[in-house]
């Protein structure tokens, strides 16, 4: 219960660190990756991330994604050579756990103080 309250407060005060995404077929199928909206990611999320984390994105970094129920997932965040950003690795664990399908809408909140993404 406390996690939900904290998340709601974060959403109200940190709305500039939220990106929205309508899932495509490739986000939920065997490709095992979520394509993150580049413009929004670079505008809202990257400036809030630690410099060292941003510098390592080409090599890929492990980040934590939490849902509103407190479940925690470790995914790989990577920047491809084409400049696009993806969640990879355990992304499909989230898809299966949440039952996501094409055209579902999700929001990602970057919690700068804890260096964690929240998926809502």
Swiss-Prot record:
Any one GO MF term held by the record is: DNA binding
Key words of the record: DNA-binding, Nucleus, Transcription, Transcription regulation
Q: Which GO terms describe its cellular component?
A: nucleus
Query: Disulfide bonds, which pairs?
Result: none
Compartments, as annotated in UniProt? Nucleus
Q: Which InterPro entries match?
A: B3_DNA-bd, B3_domain, DNA-bd_pseudobarrel_sf
Q: Does the keyword DNA-binding apply?
A: yes
Any idea which residues the entry calls the DNA-binding region?
19-120
- Among the Pfam families in the record, one is B3
Name of the protein = Putative B3 domain-containing protein At3g28853
From which organism does this entry originate? Arabidopsis thaliana
